[in-house]
Amino acid sequence: MGRKKIQITRIMDERNRQVTFTKRKFGLMKKAYELSVLCDCEIALIIFNSSNKLFQYASTDMDKVLLKYTEYNEPHESRTNSDIVEALNKKEHRGCDSPDPDTSYVLTPHTEEKYKKINEEFDNMMRNHKIAPGLPPQNFSMSVTVPVTSPNALSYTNPGSSLVSPSLAASSTLTDSSMLSPPQTTLHRNVSPGAPQRPPSTGNAGGMLSTTDLTVPNGAGSSPVGNGFVNSRASPNLIGATGANSLGKVMPTKSPPPPGGGNLGMNSRKPDLRVVIPPSSKGMMPPLSEEEELELNTQRISSSQATQPLATPVVSVTTPSLPPQGLVYSAMPTAYNTDYSLTSADLSALQGFNSPGMLSLGQVSAWQQHHLGQAALSSLVAGGQLSQGSNLSINTNQNISIKSEPISPPRDRMTPSGFQQQQQQQQQQQPPPPPQPQPQPPQPQPRQEMGRSPVDSLSSSSSSYDGSDREDPRGDFHSPIVLGRPPNTEDRESPSVKRMRMDAWVT
């Protein structure tokens, strides 16, 4: 906004009048100079102030200009103050340019009133429409971009089948400044006894690391729940430990899965919400098979019919500098433990939800009753491995005795050699099997084999069941905790075959 114009009347204050005279006199002479140079003319100014003091300005020589003036007898333009005021009024009403070359501003009462009205309107607008102060920036420990169509589009709260509280689901909308860090290293679960047992479904799990919809930390002792969050319940008996930077948080998908069995290829599926996992943490999360993934999608879609859909985003989770242990969701406090405990009805709604590292439902109650794992599993949380000489004997419905054998001395992270020593100690306590022809060792797969190597995936295993291998083409994966599968002859393999698989893991 330009300089505020004053009313053109006589200034009553002597000091202000003198200052105004000095400034405007110089301004008038400056304009006269510009006009003389620009338009090639001669200008003479004669000014007498209120005290009759003379001030004059001439573009060349005052006497020369005055001589021309006295000798000039032709008709010419002569203006006074009244002429200037009249010219300004015509300009204001007609909107045309004033023929007056004088640049001094003359404000009429009508013009002054208009300026006052404009100033009042501007002041009222500034008072009524104040700019809201900027919100403080929200600091997160890692970058998670979740574009959604609505702020509450991630809250799936169907009480019949959804097993995740609204507060936990709403925490993924990133509306508060809570620290969003990888999941808890101690994952708990409250499971009601008496639920039917289901063996884990098998299927083709190859190539699922980059497009899987749910990744459960291996050996965490927990199963997937309604919309993909790993359930965090307060059960002191079921304590698992995930590896470094393992992420178990998955958003629900938008489109329902296509009908069919577990042998559908990944190319036939519509692009769902995926978790892009950095390479440093891919090896710690064995993916679900295709059949389990389809069942999980069906359950999530059935539990979220009344909610708003997602915009099919891709969640990028990068954890470049997070410590190996001690990573918890601060947005999932233990205050939700008593409010959202699972019942048998909720568990029966989970049709076929059995991840490779899941505890079957019948044996979970035995874990809760006998209070097992306080020594061995607490060492899992601290170092990601079992302590020396810790034994776990669990009697389940199928009379399977599972023991954890002593392993190599504790390290920061279990190495392939330490895993071989554990397997060799288990094999030494078994009777020697009949000799079998040594099969051709398989060629190591460069990326997918290492993605599911026991270096990371079995760092949290609390027991090793002889015969719990997955029946899938990826024979190099040993499920760390599978208590509900009945042993059969197909699963039992000789130690030589396992030794061959361990050689493939090491590479």
Curated annotation (Swiss-Prot):
The positions making up the signal sequence are none
Q: Which residues carry this modification: N6-acetyllysine?
A: 249, 403
**Modification after translation:** Constitutive phosphorylation on Ser-408 promotes Lys-403 sumoylation thus preventing acetylation at this site. Dephosphorylation on Ser-408 by PPP3CA upon neuron depolarization promotes a switch from sumoylation to acetylation on residue Lys-403 leading to inhibition of dendrite claw differentiation. Phosphorylation on Thr-312 and Thr-319 are the main sites involved in p38 MAPK signaling and activate transcription. Phosphorylated on these sites by MAPK14/p38alpha and MAPK11/p38beta, but not by MAPK13/p38delta nor by MAPK12/p38gamma.
Identify residues that carry Phosphoserine. 59, 98, 235, 255, 355, 408, 453
Point to the regions of Pro residues compositional bias: 430-445
InterPro entries recorded = HJURP_C, MEF2-like_N, TF_MADSbox, TF_MADSbox_sf
Q: What, per the annotation, is the impact of changing residue 355 to A?
A: No effect on p38-mediated transcriptional activity
SMART domains from the UniProt entry: MADS
The PTM Phosphothreonine maps to: 312, 319, 415
Segments of this protein annotated with the region Disordered: 173-229, 243-270, 397-507
What outcome follows a substitution of residue 269 to A? Reduced p38 alpha- and beta2-mediated transcriptional activity
Extract the ranges annotated as region (Required for interaction with MAPKs).
266-283
Write out the ranges of the annotated region (Beta domain). Answer: 289-296
One of the record's GO molecular function terms: histone acetyltransferase binding
Q: Which CDD domains match?
A: MADS_MEF2_like
DNA-binding region boundaries: 58-86
Q: Which family is it part of?
A: Belongs to the MEF2 family.
Q: Which disease is it linked to?
A: Coronary artery disease, autosomal dominant, 1: A common heart disease characterized by reduced or absent blood flow in one or more of the arteries that encircle and supply the heart. Its most important complication is acute myocardial infarction.
Subunit-structure text: Binds DNA as a homo- or heterodimer. Dimerizes with MEF2D. Interacts with HDAC7. Interacts with PIAS1; the interaction enhances sumoylation. Interacts with HDAC4, HDAC9 and SLC2A4RG. Interacts (via the N-terminal) with MAPK7; the interaction results in the phosphorylation and transcriptional activity of MEF2A.
Write the protein's name: Myocyte-specific enhancer factor 2A
